[in-house]
C-alpha cells in the first residue's frame, strides 16, 4: 500500500475560538485514526478570521481521507473542513 499525504483546511466557527486549542483538537483527532500529523499552521484571513491547515500522513485505505474530514466537520469549533491537496508518496 502507498502512503497518502493530505492537506486539510479547517475553518473555525468564529474568530473567538482559541487557535492553539483548535490545533491541538485537530491533531488529536487525526491520531485517533492512526494517521500522523506532519504539521499544523494557521493563516489569517480578515477581521480576525483565520483558517487552520493540517498536514496528514497515513496509509492508503478505502474511503481515503473522508472519515477524518467528516470527523473534523463534526467538531463543535469547526465550521467546515475539506481536503485541499492530496498526494501519494
Swiss-Prot record:
InterPro entries for this protein: eEF-1beta-like_sf, EF1B_bsu/dsu_GNE, Transl_elong_EF1B/ribsomal_bS6, Transl_elong_EF1B_B_arc
UniProt-listed CDD domains: EF1B
UniProt key word Protein biosynthesis: yes
UniProt keyword annotation of Cytoplasm present: no
UniProt xrefs under SUPFAM superfamilies: eEF-1beta-like
GO MF: translation elongation factor activity
Keywords, comma-separated and alphabetical: Elongation factor, Protein biosynthesis
UniProt function note: Promotes the exchange of GDP for GTP in EF-1-alpha/GDP, thus allowing the regeneration of EF-1-alpha/GTP that could then be used to form the ternary complex EF-1-alpha/GTP/AAtRNA.
Xref: HAMAP family: EF1_beta (MF_00043)
Protein name from the UniProt record: Elongation factor 1-beta
Amino acid at each position: 500500500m502507498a502512503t497518502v499525504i493530505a492537506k486539510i483546511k479547517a475553518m473555525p466557527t468564529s474568530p473567538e475560538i482559541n487557535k492553539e486549542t483548535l490545533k491541538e483538537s485537530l491533531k488529536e483527532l487525526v491520531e485517533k485514526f492512526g494517521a500522523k500529523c506532519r504539521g499544523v499552521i494557521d493563516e489569517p484571513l480578515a477581521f480576525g478570521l483565520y483558517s487552520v491547515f493540517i498536514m496528514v500522513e497515513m496509509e492508503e485505505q478505502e474511503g481515503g481521507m473522508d472519515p477524518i474530514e467528516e470527523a473534523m466537520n463534526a467538531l463543535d469549533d469547526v465550521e467546515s473542513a475539506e481536503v485541499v491537496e492530496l498526494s501519494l508518496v
